């Protein structure tokens, strides 16, 4: 009769094997815990509202038909708000008499206000008329502006008003900002929406930081390799190894210290955020969280704050050269107060403009014109003009008393006062002259 051979008894695991298995289980448990933690963190990631300072505005200026108006003073008010005067259009050469077309009847030889409206944030001025592309601005009833306004003045009084091409009897202007109330972090923020930004602004940031943003899943092996190669060759880093998603999770959720554990968490969070959220939402959150230096007592956080501080205008009004300058500052957000620093920033800007052309995101002729422009950025970020600080303190106290606001700092409230900023500045100037 056949007898099967005896099977050997199983060996007991050695201490080394037990240690290896235990280490593997711990690593697996740690990885699972890290994934769950990262998943929970990323849930509210791009949609979490950023804290904003509360702002106090002066009285909203108004123009009314028949009321006194000095165009020079109106132009000065617009300039103080960051509006730029457009250069006068050169006169067209006179046509030969034989070829001249019949002239259309007109009350005067000048262009009527409202024809050829200026761009948003700019104005045209003549002896009897002013046209301005109003920005959007807050009012107690909601947001206003965003349309061209044309003003005609005769004998020192408003004779005609046209808002958005339509005749009106009254028109509001943008109110001056009197004060901002910052939270404990001291952050100046003007959040932007991606859909409101021109392509040149967004492309400048992408070209500087992550030109493959829309083609990777959070990590970019090619960007890491390129950054390492440039480092090895001892050249300036034109594009870092971290993707925009990595930079964002690092800025929002991770400590500043650099070590392997933090880099691992950064990579894991970046991948999970890319899985859970839309690319455009991630990019918008990034543009609202970049550090761009300091303005007075506040840190400049986000594209909206940076454009206002460095160029005195919202990002929607930046030209190609200005947009490239801001993008070139992301890696080194220092002031440009010395010739050496301005020269270094100018070089970075022009190299970035060249990269935009290489990527096909800007035309060669357009890039050459932008490279020929001066730097344009302020030597240091523009701090808001101080106006009536005692009045601002009293207004804050009144807001807390009347509306039960516990803390204005970082609350994002908009307060509107009755103070006339123009009269206040004239009074301060008169006192200073005595």
Language model region names:
Residues 2-434:
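Juxtamembrane regions of bacterial inner-membrane/periplasmic proteins
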């Amino acid at each position: 009769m056949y007898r099967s051979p005896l099977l050997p008894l199983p060996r007991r695991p050695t201490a080394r094997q037990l240690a290896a298995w235990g280490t593997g289980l711990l690593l697996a448990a740690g990885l699972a815990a890290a994934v769950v933690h990262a998943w929970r963190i990323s849930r509210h990631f791009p949609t979490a509202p950023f804290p904003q300072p509360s702002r106090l505005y002066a009285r909203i200026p108004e123009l009314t038909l028949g009321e006194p108006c000095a165009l020079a003073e109106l132009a000065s008010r617009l300039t103080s708000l960051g509006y730029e005067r457009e250069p006068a259009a050169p006169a067209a050469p006179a046509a030969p008499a034989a070829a001249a077309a019949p002239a259309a009847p007109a009350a005067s030889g000048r262009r009527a206000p409202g024809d050829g409206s200026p761009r948003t944030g700019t104005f045209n001025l003549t002896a009897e008329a002013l046209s301005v592309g109003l920005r959007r601005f807050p009012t107690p009833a909601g947001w206003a502006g965003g349309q061209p306004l044309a003003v005609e003045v005769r004998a020192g009084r408003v004779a005609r008003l046209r808002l958005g091409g339509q005749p009106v009897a009254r028109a509001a202007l943008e109110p001056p900002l009197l004060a901002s109330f910052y939270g404990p972090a001291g952050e100046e923020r003007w959040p932007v929406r991606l859909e409101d930004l021109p392509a040149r602004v967004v492309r400048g940031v992408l070209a500087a930081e992550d030109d493959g943003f829309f083609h990777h899943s959070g990590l970019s092996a090619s960007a890491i390799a390129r950054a390492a190669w440039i480092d090895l060759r001892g050249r300036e880093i034109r594009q870092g190894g971290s993707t925009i998603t990595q930079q964002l999770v690092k800025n929002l959720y991770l400590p500043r210290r650099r070590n392997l554990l933090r880099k691992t968490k950064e990579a894991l969070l970046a991948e999970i955020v890319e899985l859970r959220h839309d690319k455009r939402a991630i990019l918008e959150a990034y543009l609202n969280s970049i550090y761009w230096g300091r303005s007075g007592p506040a840190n400049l956080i986000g594209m909206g704050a940076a454009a206002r501080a460095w160029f005195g205008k919202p990002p929607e009004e930046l030209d190609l050269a200005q947009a490239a300058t801001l993008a070139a500052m992301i890696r080194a957000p220092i002031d440009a107060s010395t010739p050496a620093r301005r020269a270094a920033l100018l070089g970075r800007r022009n190299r970035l403009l060249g990269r935009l052309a290489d990527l096909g995101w800007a035309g060669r002729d357009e890039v050459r014109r932008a490279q020929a422009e001066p730097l344009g950025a302020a030597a240091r970020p523009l701090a808001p003009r101080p106006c009536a600080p005692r009045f601002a303190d009293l207004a804050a106290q009144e807001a807390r008393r009347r509306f039960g606001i516990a803390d204005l700092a970082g609350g994002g409230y908009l307060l509107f006062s009755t103070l006339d900023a123009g009269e206040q500045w004239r009074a301060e100037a008169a006192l200073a002259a005595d």
